[in-house]
Swiss-Prot record:
<dbReference type="GO" id="GO:0005773">
    <property type="term" value="C:vacuole"/>
</dbReference>
<dbReference type="InterPro" id="IPR049083">
    <property type="entry name" value="TACO1_YebC_N"/>
</dbReference>
<dbReference type="GO" id="GO:0009507">
    <property type="term" value="C:chloroplast"/>
</dbReference>
<dbReference type="Pfam" id="PF20772">
    <property type="entry name" value="TACO1_YebC_N"/>
</dbReference>
<dbReference type="InterPro" id="IPR029072">
    <property type="entry name" value="YebC-like"/>
</dbReference>
<dbReference type="InterPro" id="IPR002876">
    <property type="entry name" value="Transcrip_reg_TACO1-like"/>
</dbReference>
<dbReference type="InterPro" id="IPR026564">
    <property type="entry name" value="Transcrip_reg_TACO1-like_dom3"/>
</dbReference>
<protein>
    <recommendedName>
        <fullName>Probable transcriptional regulatory protein At2g25830</fullName>
    </recommendedName>
</protein>
<dbReference type="InterPro" id="IPR017856">
    <property type="entry name" value="Integrase-like_N"/>
</dbReference>
<dbReference type="InterPro" id="IPR048300">
    <property type="entry name" value="TACO1_YebC-like_2nd/3rd_dom"/>
</dbReference>
<dbReference type="Pfam" id="PF01709">
    <property type="entry name" value="Transcrip_reg"/>
</dbReference>
<comment type="similarity">
    <text>Belongs to the TACO1 family.</text>
</comment>
Length: 331
């Protein structure tokens, strides 16, 4: 690659939860230019083949355009929204939310283990479903004792397999929520969810009336203190990620708040393991979670009162043992 050429990483804003992946230039999007002279050291670990496949090198504009047409230049979207004076919108607190998410992950993996053992037995050699779950648990650093405990639990008398259910809810201010459940007692779970929604002012929605507002993605969450943003972008590009979402900032953030922010790498099912491997190779720690989330296609802005009420409703839903996750399209 010629020394005078520049390599651009196009960072397109993840606007309202929608990835604007087809836009190459826009005044509404943040553009980051990485020049070869400034990034040779950062790119030293990337092979020539990988560099060629992900970046466009050219000395003239016409050559750039030809390369854009010939190569699939991957565009990584990233946003840095500033939330002015709305500290109350930090749903359950960033650290608390991550701790809760980790606990929910362990619980869900345990449920999946129970279901797999109930259906195919405790031997992962003959039970491919269990083998897949065990691989996932290892990949996500789920403690071994949790897995072993739930393998034993599956053989207990009266223990039933777990079933996945989705419940859709309307919150305050036109906000929608999706509640993911993995339960061995459907009647118990729906009764508990309906009770919480009613008690905290929400409304149960008909099936399908909310889900279309979200999209399912594979994600990797990385604490901002664990990696430099530019480093993450290089890793994401090299591993075939689709987007990198930068966490929101608040004007009244404390140092502790800033340390509890997380980047979110969005990728496909096929590239998910590759992303994790690349992060491990680079010594970047990531948060163990199930790697699957619902992101809103658009977001709804509400006033402070509605925001607090939605926060309380979400918290109460997440306190239910059968509930694994709650997703919201609130801005």
């Amino acid at each position: 690659m010629a020394s005078h050429c520049s390599m651009r990483v196009i960072l397109l804003r993840f606007s309202n939860g929608v990835s604007s992946r087809s836009i190459l230039n826009s005044t509404n999007h943040r553009l980051l230019s990485l020049t070869m002279t400034n990034t040779l050291s950062s790119l030293s670990s990337i092979s020539p083949h990988t560099t060629t496949s992900h970046f466009t090198a050219a000395s003239q504009q016409s050559d750039d355009q030809n390369c854009f047409r010939k190569l699939q230049l991957r565009k990584i979207s990233i946003s840095t929204p500033l939330c002015m004076g709305r500290r109350s919108s930090k749903i359950a607190g960033r650290k608390g939310a991550q701790d809760s998410k980790k606990a929910k992950l362990y619980c869900r993996i345990g449920k999946e283990v129970v279901s797999a053992v109930k259906k195919g037995g405790p031997n992962p050699v003959s039970n491919t479903t269990l083998a897949t779950i065990l691989d996932k648990a290892k990949e996500l650093d789920v403690p071994k004792d949790i897995v072993e405990r739930n393998i034993k639990r599956a053989s207990e008398k009266g223990q039933e397999a777990f079933i996945e259910k989705i419940y859709e809810v309307y919150g305050y201010g036109g906000v929608s929520m999706v509640v993911e459940v993995l339960t061995d007692k459907i009647n118990r779970s729906v009764a508990a969810i309906r009770s919480v929604v009613k008690d905290y002012g929400g409304k149960m929605a008909d099936s399908g009336s909310v889900m279309f507002k979200f999209k399912r993605v594979r994600v990797v969450n990385i604490k901002v203190t664990e990696a430099d943003k530019d480093q993450l972008l290089i890793i994401a590009l090299d591993a075939g990620a689709e987007d990198v979402i930068e966490p929101p900032t608040y004007e009244d953030d404390t140092d502790e708040d800033r340390e509890e922010r997380y980047y979110k790498i969005v990728t496909s099912n096929e590239n998910y393991s590759t992303i994790l491997s690349k992060l491990r190779d680079e010594g970047v720690n990531f948060e163990p979670d199930n790697g699957s989330e619902l992101l809103p296609l658009t977001t709804v802005e509400v006033d402070d009162e509605a925001m607090e009420l939605n926060k309380e409703l979400m918290q109460k839903l997440l306190e239910l043992d059968d509930v694994d996750a709650v997703y919201i399209d609130q801005k």
